[in-house]
Structures are given as structure tokens and as C-alpha cells.
């Protein structure tokens, strides 16, 4: 089955027995007072029409033209005020968002899109193979048990606390999600070109817009859980198929771009092939 087993409730995590050689994992009440991931969302101009927003633990991208804004990914549910703030800094309101384009439907990328779709009727698009995931017909996401087994590690404890605070436990989808077609893409700000990049999820898709590769989680440059900074893959625990993630690097290497806007981490400038080679070297 493409779907992973439904994640247990967090009440179950409180009674999950830790291994004897490790400190007991904190209860999720304790996570509420754990140290926060530092920093405010940073707005970074990439081109005249593309802005990267680096949130606390995830990024989103704003693409503008004279018709409005295309939002690529939307952070956690709890990132909504930061998303709205990034729009306001460019002079836009929620109603100016023409559409939301998802690289994939994990909660840290789909989160505030739920609000835009329900409150403003904002169209939400993704690759056809990701539509069912966005609607929550199934869920391809790391289970809470997998996370619980790792929160004895400081980085995992801090990151997990951020997930809890940011609404990362909800299982809501967006029933109105539609598949992105070439015709739809041609009418959106920036005229994004889909670059199918499965692995992190079965229907993950990156986008080329104004010469910039918006890679989602197919290729990142950093994450609160990772010490290394620079082009790399996310840990295999977060992906539907790590082998497909590695294969996808070859497809991304063919993209004609010298700018990488990742789903996590900082903006990266240089030939995309160099970024994919660096990520592949780390994955081996």
C-alpha cells in the first residue's frame, strides 16, 4: 500500500517504553515548555518576482506578478500569521493569493493552505499523484511512534516541541485540492514548470519558476535536526522511498538553474548539478 499506517495518538507516546540505555523520552506536556527553535521568518528576495521566506523550521515561496501572488507551500498551520506577514511585507493581502502550489502534502508544507482554502476559497494545486495525499485519502508521513523513539536526542526534542506548538499533529486535508495541469500553470504568476521529483512522497514535485528551482523536500540545504549545512537529502525516516529520493537527484541535476530554493534551509546559488552531486555524496 502507498499509505503508511495511521499514526497513533500522542497519548500512546506517553506510555511508549524507552530503551534502557537511553534517557526516558519526555512526555508531550514537557515538550510544551521545551526550548523553542530560534528566529523569525526571514524574507529573502531571490529574483524580481521570487521571494523565499525562511520560517522557523520550514520555508515557503512567494511568486508575484501584476495579477497577484502564487504561494508555493504554506508552512505549518501555526505558521499562518508568518505567512500573512510575509504577504503584507510585499504589499499583499490574503485575497491576492491567486493559488497555492504544493510541492507535497506533509503538514509542514500544507498547513496554512488549509485556512486559505476554507476561508478564502484559494485554489490549491499539486502533482496529480499527490492529490489524494493532500485530500488525506491516505497519509505518507513519519509516524509519531518513530518520532517518540528519537526525542531523547536534544535536537529531536526541540524540533518535536515545535511541531506540537505549530499544529503539526492535525490530520486535516484539503478536499478541494486539484491536480496541476500545464494549462493551469500557464495562467499562474511565474508560469511554474513542474519537475516531478518523487521519493520524499510518492507525488512530490519541484517547480522551476523565473529560473529558480523550488525543490521542496526533494533537495534541502538544512534542517533543525541536521548539523550539516548545504545541499543534502532529509533523513530517510521522513521519506516514502529514500531510493527514489536518490534517483530524483539525477532528474534534478538536469534542471537548467543556478538558484535553489529549498523547503528547508537557506537559499543556495550555483549550478543545480553541483548541489545534487553534493547531496548524493552525503547519501552514499
Model features per residue range: what roles?
Residues 70-72, 101, 124, 213-215, ...:
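Residue-level marker for buried hydrophobic side chains located in beta-strands
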Residues 5-13, 17, 23-26, 31, ...:
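Intrinsically disordered, low-complexity proline-rich tandem-repeat tracts
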Residues 88-177:
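Active-site HxH/HxHxD metal-binding segment of metal-dependent hydrolases
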Residues 76-78, 166-171, 175, 184-187, ...:
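Metallo-beta-lactamase
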Residues 41-90, 206-218:
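Conserved beta-strand hairpin/beta-sheet module of binuclear metal-dependent hydrolase folds
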Residues 267-284:
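Binuclear metal-ion centers of metallo-dependent hydrolases, dominated by the metallo-beta-lactamase
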Residues 46, 119-120, 256:
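Short, structured coil segments at secondary-structure junctions
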Amino acid at each position: 500500500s502507498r499509505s503508511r499506517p495511521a499514526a497513533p495518538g500522542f497519548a500512546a507516546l506517553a506510555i511508549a517504553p524507552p530503551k534502557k540505555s537511553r534517557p526516558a523520552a519526555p512526555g508531550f506536556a514537557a515538550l510544551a515548555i521545551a526550548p523553542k527553535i530560534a528566529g523569525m521568518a526571514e524574507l529573502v528576495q531571490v529574483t524580481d518576482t521570487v521571494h523565499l521566506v525562511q520560517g522557523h523550521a520550514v520555508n515557503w515561496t512567494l511568486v508575484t506578478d501584476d495579477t497577484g501572488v502564487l504561494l508555493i507551500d504554506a508552512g505549518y498551520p501555526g505558521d499562518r500569521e508568518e505567512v500573512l506577514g510575509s504577504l503584507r511585507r510585499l504589499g499583499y493581502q490574503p485575497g491576492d493569493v491567486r493559488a497555492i502550489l504544493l510541492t507535497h502534502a506533509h503538514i509542514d508544507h500544507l498547513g496554512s493552505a488549509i485556512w486559505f482554502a476554507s476561508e478564502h476559497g484559494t485554489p490549491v494545486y499539486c502533482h496529480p499523484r499527490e492529490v489524494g495525499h493532500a485530500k488525506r485519502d491516505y497519509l505518507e508521513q513519519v509516524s509519531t511512534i518513530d518520532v517518540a523513539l528519537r526525542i531523547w536526542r536534544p535536537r529531536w526534542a526541540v524540533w518535536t516541541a515545535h511541531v506540537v506548538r505549530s499544529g503539526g499533529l492535525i490530520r486535516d486535508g484539503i478536499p478541494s485540492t486539484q491536480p496541476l495541469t500545464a494549462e493551469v500553470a500557464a495562467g499562474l504568476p511565474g508560469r511554474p514548470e513542474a519537475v516531478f521529483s518523487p521519493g520524499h512522497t510518492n507525488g512530490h514535485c519541484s517547480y522551476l519558476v523565473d529560473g529558480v528551482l523550488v525543490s521542496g523536500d526533494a533537495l534541502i540545504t538544512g534542517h533543525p535536526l541536521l548539523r550539516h549545512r548545504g545541499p543534502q537529502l532529509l533523513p530517510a525516516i521522513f521519506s516514502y522511498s529514500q531510493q527514489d529520493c536518490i534517483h530524483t537527484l539525477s532528474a534534478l541535476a538536469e534542471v537548467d538553474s543556478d538558484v535553489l530554493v529549498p523547503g528547508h534551509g537557506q537559499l543556495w546559488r550555483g549550478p543545480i548539478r553541483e548541489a545534487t552531486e553534493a547531496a548524493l555524496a552525503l547519501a552514499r
